[in-house]
Amino acid sequence: MSIIISHQSAIELLRTDYVYQIIANTSKGTFRHPPLIPNRPPHLSEKRELWKTLHEILGSKPQLPIHVSITSNNGVYQTKGLQIHILNEKIPKTAFFEILPNLYLTKPEYIPIQMSRSCSILELALLASKLMGTYYIDQEGELKSRESPLITRKKLERFLRKHSDVPGCAKVWSALALSCEKAASPMEVKLFIRATLPCSKGGYGLGEMRLNQEYKVKKLTSQTKAFAIRKPDLVFETPKASRDKQPWKAITLEYNGQYHTTVEQQIADGIRHNELVSAGIKNYQVDKEIYYDFNCMQNLVVCIRKDIGLPERKLSHEEQIRYRKRQQDLVKLLDSIDPARWGSNVKQENHR
């Protein structure tokens, strides 16, 4: 019998190199799809074999319960170690692909729709950004990088348009409006959301931006004329009306996490920063302490707004107090989202 792994368990498997290589090495249209969607959950012997298989793929025990999807709820009961989901009849077999004989997985573009019932819009935005990013968190909790994302925004949007009548699509569209592509870490995603959300939602309203855009710069450590490619975390979009007045080629913002605390990395970061500045790129940097310092972040945003030609925001004392509360609430909300258990800590928020 075929088994379809879905929801949280599918997300867990998508971060493995085994599944990533299947996606990366499979040409468009050549995925193997289930011949039939199963209409019953796995029996006890099948469940034991499934647990063993997932353990081998993950390299550790799978999170319980294991989420599986079927087509019918006739006589279906929840059983220990499994979470049974009933598939919407409008979802085609092509939303799943084979990872082993008779074992199928939800495709990345369908994951946000599956998770839409249990996730808030903001949580879905982080999930979509993760699927469209070049990072993943391994089983030991370590941040790792990949050459390319599991899915592009274009592909996800195409799936949503094609299946617009499936419940959850509208919610995912709302989340997609808050999400980003090409993020290299979870903190880049959070910084992006804080920077781009409107001020009424606790963000800084800094407009559109790109992540990890490549810039060719002169290597300052080279004795010969050599160049290097640098990719700042966030690149701000300068309004057309301000571009002629802009002395800088670009305004960028970077997050320096724990990896950047060693002496060797700080030296490399200093050289990299100077290379960007020498190439005409104004490069702001924040670390964990600055990220959580609301006064420092607000003052930094004032500078960035001026650099990219956005008007200064003038607030009364009472408005400033209310705005600061919204900023704090947003940061708390972002921190409350558990990337290992999507939908486990749903908060009510209005970021539509």
Model-derived features with residue positions:
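Short gly/ser-rich loop at a beta-strand->alpha-helix junction or flexible surface loop bordering the NTP-binding
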Residues: M1-P167, K325-R352
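Surface segments flanking catalytic/ligand-binding clefts of nucleic-acid enzymes
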Residues: E147-R352
